[in-house]
Amino acid sequence: MRAIEIKNLTFSYDKQEKVFNNLSLDIEKGKYCVVLGRNGSGKSTLAKLITGLLTIQEGQIKVDGIEINEKNIYDIRNRIGIVFQNPDNQFIGATVRDDIAFGLENHLVAQDKMDQIINEYAQKVGMDKYLDKEPSNLSGGQKQRVAIAGVLAMTPDIVIFDEATSMLDPKGKKEIKEVILKMRELFKDMTILSITHDVEEALLADEVIVVDNGEIAIQGTPEEVFIKDDLLKKLSLDIPFVYKFKNLLGKNGIEMDTIDIEKMVKKLCQ
């Protein structure tokens, strides 16, 4: 079953050059999909169109089989959660507890049930010991984990990370990647779509989509995408170190059937 279906999508800002021109793309339910692309490639615009934050001009987008339009937009938004780039801009509550509660309060969840949900999802992202902390006492990675807890508390079918690690230090980025991996374990049917520059994150995904000039330049598993190092360089994208190493070995006649560095070294030493 498809979580997201995009057919013949065309979009431009203020009659400027088209960001997308007849784009079609399907994302399967329960998959972890990473969208890569250089600045201006259309990655974040795609996320905003899927969530209904931008209006579709031509073509069609369906979420869980429901077409995005004025009639269905609120239903669509209830099915999708989004974590944005800047952790400070999305922290609404005075404390961690208040921030996770924000969406639940808007849905008139009873207080006793709300407390249970807050504790449950704070624990899932490792923030249960910080429930009464103010945002000024949290790191960027911790704030993003709170944002994720608030999204998960609403039990969406799809979670979109829109450059959610780009403003974080290495420790914060590692924390968010660990949370995403945990989400995959806990929520098997949840679809995760991550818009990012981080090629190392893409190693963890089921599918990688490379966008360039509003078109799908490459799509496939991490293995299928990162083996195309020459094409990725033309698209101004780096590749993960492990694939640089593997591709270099391949060009020198040494084929590897793994991307585990330790296994590669062991094989080379045989």
Show the residue positions of the predicted features:
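The feature captures the beta-strand-to-loop junction immediately N-terminal to the Walker
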Residues: L36-R38
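Helix-to-loop junction immediately C-terminal to a conserved catalytic motif
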Residues: T51
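Conserved ABC transporter NBD signature motif
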Residues: G59-E67, I76
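Conserved ABC ATPase "signature" region
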Residues: D112-K129
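Conserved ABC ATPase signature
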Residues: E134-L138, Q142
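Catalytic Walker B motif of ABC-type/P-loop ATPase nucleotide-binding domains
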Residues: V159-D162
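Conserved ABC ATPase "signature" C-loop
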Residues: N213-G214
